[in-house]
Swiss-Prot record:
A Gene Ontology biological process term: RNA processing
Superkingdom classification of source: Archaea
Effect of residue 49 to A: 100-fold decrease in kinase activity against both DNA and RNA
GO molecular function: ATP binding; ATP hydrolysis activity; ATP-dependent polydeoxyribonucleotide 5'-hydroxyl-kinase activity; ATP-dependent polyribonucleotide 5'-hydroxyl-kinase activity
Regulation: DNA kinase activity is inhibited by 250 mM sodium chloride whereas RNA kinase activity is unaffected.
Necessary cofactors: a divalent metal cation
InterPro entries, per the entry: AAA+_ATPase, Clp1/Grc3, CLP1_P, P-loop_NTPase
Description of pH dependence: Optimum pH is 4.5 to 9.5 using 24-mer 5'-OH DNA as substrate and 4.5 to 6.5 using 24-mer 5'-OH RNA as substrate.
Primary role: Polynucleotide kinase that can phosphorylate the 5'-hydroxyl groups of both single-stranded RNA (ssRNA) and single-stranded DNA (ssDNA). Exhibits a strong preference for ssRNA.
Effect of residue 73 to A: Abrogates kinase activity against both DNA and RNA
Name of the protein: Polyribonucleotide 5'-hydroxyl-kinase PH0197
Swiss-Prot/TrEMBL catalytic activity: a 5'-end dephospho-2'-deoxyribonucleoside-DNA + ATP = a 5'-end 5'-phospho-2'-deoxyribonucleoside-DNA + ADP + H(+); a 5'-end dephospho-ribonucleoside-RNA + ATP = a 5'-end 5'-phospho-ribonucleoside-RNA + ADP + H(+)
Length: 361
């Protein structure tokens, strides 16, 4: 049987050969599709999506097909690093997605897709287009976000990617709002009784181990914002605020402003409070960000094609010199043309320090 177990503290899903009958039916269905074929696997958390992906990839390899896998479960990534969508090509049998060598990544910048629908859809689209050039079958493993906004996210992915087959792992028709209208390309599969459920704390611990492993053998690299494209933040958009404007804002709100930009008629400032107490700030006029929250912020290091070559942790920033000091395991920095700011703070030991709302930065 296929089992979901915790092994060495880093992964949940592993391959075995005994599977429910409907998994064989799924493999037969995929084998009969016109190639290249794209298959999207959906289901709630802890329904065996990754386990199914592993089984199908191994079975299809045995049948002589070229297979690729897109791991888009940003919060429970098997193909490192977290907070990205990753593509790997399968050239031999394997037992865990962690065994695969990633070919390309797309940076999302957080471990929850709720405020990042654009990145989630575009990332899977770009990687699927790339994968189809070299694969007979593209298997897309997805997040367990299937309720509320998750319905719209899954439907947007289906509309954008146009999969040839949707494999729906469900218990009691909970996927109906997602697959309604796509029944002709959907195959429903039952959730195995052997699937293990993981608590929030267990998931966080799994992520901690993966962050820690990813940042092993990292080094500090310096980037200059004047020499590289910086996205995912308003910090370097618009024009610098004038000294008089800076002084006025500091007096009004009891701030020390370390960096400020004027974006049309609005201001964006990075500040430190100089006194305690409440402040009434019209965020339609002034957006502000606490300097301390820049520490250990996750950054994506992108190439000219928009693919993520790896991620880094912001360790220091010098606004006057435009200098960013980034801890990263990425070796070839020469191909990095863009730095994209994420919305999770994490240390290199894997400890997550918190998520940021998309609009704050």
């Amino acid at each position: 049987m296929l089992t979901e177990v915790c092994k060495m503290g880093t992964n949940k899903a592993f391959f075995t050969n005994e599977v429910p009958e409907d998994r064989y039916i799924a493999a037969e269905k995929i084998s009969s599709l016109k190639k290249p074929a794209t298959v999207m696997i959906i289901g709630d958390v802890d329904t065996g999506k990754t386990t199914l992906t592993i089984y199908l990839a191994n079975e299809l390899i045995s049948r002589g097909f070229r297979v690729s896998i897109i791991d888009s479960d940003v919060g429970q990534k098997s193909i490192l690093p977290p907070a990205t969508i990753s593509l790997a090509f399968v050239d031999t049998h394997f037992s865990s997605l962690e065994d695969l060598t990633p070919f390309a990544h797309y940076f999302v910048g957080t471990i929850t897709p709720s405020q990042f629908f654009g990145e989630m859809v575009i990332g899977v689209m770009k990687l699927a287009e790339l994968a189809k050039k070299f694969s007979d079958v593209v298997l897309i493993d997805t997040t367990g976000m299937i309720y509320g906004p998750g319905v719209e996210l899954k439907r947007m992915k289906i509309e954008a990617i146009k999969p040839d087959l949707i494999l729906a792992l469900e218990r009691e028709n909970e996927l109906t709002p997602i697959i309604k209208g796509f029944e002709d390309i959907t195959l429903k599969l039952r959730v195995s009784d052997k699937v293990k459920e993981f608590s929030r704390s267990e998931r966080k611990e799994l992520r901690r181990e993966k962050w820690k492993r990813y940042f092993e053998n990292s080094r500090i690299v310096t980037f200059n914002v004047n020499d590289i494209l910086v996205t995912g933040t308003s910090m370097f958009q618009g024009k610098p605020i004038e000294e008089g404007e800076k002084n006025l804002l500091e007096r009004l709100f009891k701030w020390l402003i370390l960096h400020g930009r004027k974006l049309g008629e609005r201001y964006f400032v990075v500040k430190v409070d100089t006194s305690e107490g409440p402040r009434v700030v019209d965020k339609n006029v002034v957006r502000y960000f606490d300097f301390s929250k820049l520490s250990n912020l996750l950054l994506g290091l992108l190439d000219k094609e928009g693919f993520c070559q790896g991620v880094g942790i912001l360790k220091a920033i010098n606004f006057s010199e435009g200098r960013l000091e980034v801890l990263t395991p990425v070796k070839d920095i020469s191909i990095i043309t863009e730095i994209r700011f994420g919305r999770i703070r994490v240390r290199e030991d894997g400890e997550e320090l918190g998520l940021l709302d998309r609009e704050v930065l």
